[in-house]
Amino acid sequence: MDNNVDTITLTDEEGKETEFEVITKLDIEDKEYVVVVPKNEEVDEAIALRIDNNDNGEEVLVPVEEDEEFNMVAEAYELLFSEE
């Protein structure tokens, strides 16, 4: 995923599209992640997504659902933004 992406549009299982603002991209243990927030909604929680490749080699965004992996991303995010 390009580092200069400001927004992305994701489609859920029901076909509903939602635009997200990309807060940051993180590289952790040979994996790439993006942290996003819904662009036009009043939500304080960020969403962590892992960048994977599908069978065709195309990048896909996968929600981080495992607690250990989520905590690792959250820690890196907090460390990055605590330095600012």
Swiss-Prot record:
Family annotation (Pfam families): DUF1292 (PF06949)
InterPro entries the record matches: UPF0473
Highest taxon of the lineage: Bacteria
Transmembrane segments: none
Family: Belongs to the UPF0473 family.
Record-given protein name: UPF0473 protein CBO2561/CLC_2432
Protein species of origin: Clostridium botulinum (strain Hall / ATCC 3502 / NCTC 13319 / Type A)
